[in-house]
Amino acid sequence: KAQEPWFGIEQEYTLLNSVTKWPLGWPKGGYPAGQGPYYCSVGAGRSIGRDIPEVHYRCCLHAGIQISGVNGEVLPSQWEYQVGPVEGIAMGDQMWMSRYLMYRVAELFNVEVTFDPKPIPGDWNGSGGHVNFSNRQPESPPAGKQSRSSAKKLGKRHRWHIAAYGEGNERRLTGKHETSSMNDFSWGVANRGCSIRVGRMVPVEKCGYYEDRRPSSNLDPYVVTRLLVETTLL
């Protein structure tokens, strides 16, 4: 507890047509134009189902969940919301409640939600549950050295973490579509293709966070946050 572990989780998900079980707004039995124009987009045909994440955002605020943002993702009809920063085990509490609210909101629109890490096979992005992590250490080394030390510890237990980071994650962690390969461990500054991404300003400001990009969208937040603390702080 003295370390004050703080977490922020980026929860990605995909909206599905409740009848066809195909992504919302996609041609029946077909595909939309390729990825590129959908990420953080605006406009009909690009930003699909926006009402759902916006209503969900407001529900989370009313429920006391520390939701901190929403954005459209790379796959059309894929969205993300962020919860945090939250300290310790409360991260798991808030993430599970936010998921419940997402299901309830989507129900009102007669839309289904999937947290599958690779809802559409092929040349399409999967869905992750990236975990941002930081902690307070009064006598800690500079953040750059601390990040390197944590990365080395995480690298030694890479397979252990991968086994607990979500069901079906092997379909997502291929080394393509802004992921690292699940068979290799890597870290870097502002690099989305790494297992661990260190914030761009960490080397400059000598403080900050790092992002574990390996967890899938169906991660158990209690398990993942516990593993990060066990591996890097205990």
UniProtKB/Swiss-Prot annotation:
Provide the residue span(s) of the region labelled Disordered.
Answer: 126-157
Membrane-spanning regions, if any?
none
Annotated InterPro entries: Gln_synth/guanido_kin_cat_dom, Gln_synth_cat_dom, Gln_synth_gly_rich_site, Glutamine_Synthetase
GS catalytic domain location is 1-234
Q: Which organism is it from?
A: Dunaliella salina
Classification via SUPFAM superfamilies:
Glutamine synthetase/guanido kinase
Q: Has the keyword RNA-binding been applied to this entry?
A: no
Listed under catalytic activity are: L-glutamate + NH4(+) + ATP = L-glutamine + ADP + phosphate + H(+)
Q: Which family, according to the similarity comment? A: Belongs to the glutamine synthetase family.
The molecular function GO annotations come to:
ATP binding; glutamine synthetase activity
Reported EC number(s) for this entry are 6.3.1.2
Cross-referenced PROSITE patterns? GLNA_ATP, GS_CATALYTIC
- Keywords in alphabetical order, please: ATP-binding, Cytoplasm, Ligase, Nucleotide-binding
Compartments it resides in: Cytoplasm
Tell me how this protein assembles: Homooctamer.
Q: Does the keyword Translocase apply?
A: no
Q: Name one GO cellular component term.
A: cytoplasm
Q: Which Pfam families match?
A: Gln-synt_C (PF00120)
- Protein name as catalogued: Glutamine synthetase
Which Gene3D superfamilies does the record associate with it?
Glutamine synthetase/guanido kinase, catalytic domain (3.30.590.10)
What biological-process terms (Gene Ontology) are attached?
glutamine biosynthetic process
